[in-house]
Amino acid sequence: MKILAIFRAKIGVSMSQVLPHIAEEERMAWAKYLTGELRETYLTSQPGVVLDMFEAPSVAELQQEMLALPLMRAGLLEATYLGLTQKPRLAAVIRVAYTHPKTLV
């Protein structure tokens, strides 16, 4: 299942609180990337907000795994997890309708 994770620094968290945890946080993120679990990472125009796209069995399992991250353990981040489902694009629907017209009736 694809899961969008939105990580936000909690209000009042300073960079000096975050810096001691960055090396371990990045090491753990890189390990998730190498296993294919972490698919994409995006920085945003909002300071302190990062978007990560994961592939995981469920939102609940990913939430549990993310509690091991140093910034989460230190209570410096809050996270929102959104399970995503893929819907057929219009072009794909049109293609099916054109090649198999009776399937959409």
Positions of the model-derived regions?
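Conserved, structured core segments of small domains
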Residues: M1-V105
